[in-house]
Structure formats: structure tokens, C-alpha cells
Design a protein with these regions (language model features):
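Ubiquitin-like/PB1-type beta-grasp interaction modules and other compact soluble beta-rich domains
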Residues: 1-176
Length: 176
């Protein structure tokens, strides 16, 4: 009887050892990926880049520092109640993923707020994008690199007003 109990105890210990060993193997070989991430993104932590952003709608600055826009994705986000610095934590993460995570629609003609209010290019007003002072037609597929500056405007701005916005953005601190 004692021998039987010893064999059972040894068997239980062996099973526990196998489980612990397997769990240890999985832990040591796992990647830092989380489900639901951006397509073609690298592992979390594969990059840490920062970019400044300024969004002006009819001259009014959009505030990403509100809690509704803070850390909505581990891959790319705003954090620390700062609405002017984008933090990217993996390679292959495009700006479209950031805006989707904030429930903001974005394409080459429209900027759509989470409440559905949209600002679309028409005969009087236009949506414009600038990356590092250069006009671009769309930013969705753009992947930020360290110290980028991104301007999004909607309205009927003069070239002088655009230059003022770009200057404001250039002087804006990127919080790292």
C-alpha cells in the first residue's frame, strides 16, 4: 500500500514537472505580440518612436489630451494626458491604425469625428495633410519615424495661415 502511494506521488510530481517545464518553455520562446494588432505590425516593443501632431479644424485645435483619446491601443497612442505627441511601440504601424483606434474616420477627403460629424473637402473648404512641412495627399499608410511633425487642417486657410500652423507645429515639444 505504501509503495502504491509512493508511485502515485511520484507520478503526480512528474506530471507537475512536465507542466512547469512546458510552461517555462512557452514563456521563454513567446513573442511579445498581442491579439487584434495592426496587420503587418512587428512585436510590441520592436520600436519606440515619437511624432508631434497638430489638428486644426476651421482654425480650432483638436485636443487629443482628453481621456477618450489616451492609450486606446498598445501599438500607437497618445499618453500622459498629452495630446500633441504620438507614441508608436512597434514597427509596421501606420497612422490609419491610430485614428481607427480613436474611432476617427480619415481618408484623402474627410475627417470624421467619433460622433459622426464629418469635415470633407468641398468647393469652399479642404482637408490638407502635411508631414515635416511637406504637403501629402493622404496619411493613412504613413508610418511615423522619430521626431516627425504631422499637420492636419480643414478649412479655407490661406497659404500664410498654413505657414503659421506649420511654424506652431515646428515649435511644439515632442514629449518622449
Amino acid at each position: 500500500e505504501k509503495r502504491k502511494q509512493t508511485l502515485i506521488a511520484e507520478g503526480v510530481i512528474a506530471v507537475i514537472a512536465v507542466i512547469v517545464g512546458y510552461a517555462g518553455y512557452l514563456f521563454l520562446t513567446m513573442t511579445v505580440e498581442a491579439p487584434g494588432g495592426p496587420e503587418n505590425a512587428g512585436a510590441l516593443g520592436s520600436e519606440h518612436s515619437h511624432a508631434g501632431i497638430l489638428v486644426k479644424i476651421f482654425g480650432d485645435e483638436f485636443d487629443f489630451s482628453a481621456p477618450a483619446y489616451q492609450i486606446k491601443s498598445p501599438w500607437i497612442h497618445f499618453e500622459s494626458r498629452d495630446g500633441t505627441t504620438i507614441h508608436k511601440h512597434a514597427t509596421g504601424v501606420e497612422l490609419e491604425y491610430l485614428f481607427n483606434s480613436l474611432s476617427i474616420g480619415l481618408d484623402d477627403e474627410c475627417y470624421v469625428f467619433p460622433d459622426g460629424k464629418s469635415f470633407c473637402t468641398n468647393d469652399e473648404y479642404s482637408l490638407k495633410y502635411f508631414i515635416n512641412d511637406e504637403p501629402v495627399s493622404d496619411i493613412r499608410e504613413y508610418e511615423i519615424v522619430e521626431d516627425d511633425k504631422i499637420l492636419i487642417t480643414f478649412g479655407g486657410e490661406t497659404p500664410e495661415q498654413i505657414q503659421e500652423y506649420l511654424s506652431e507645429l515646428r515649435n511644439q515639444e515632442i514629449r518622449k
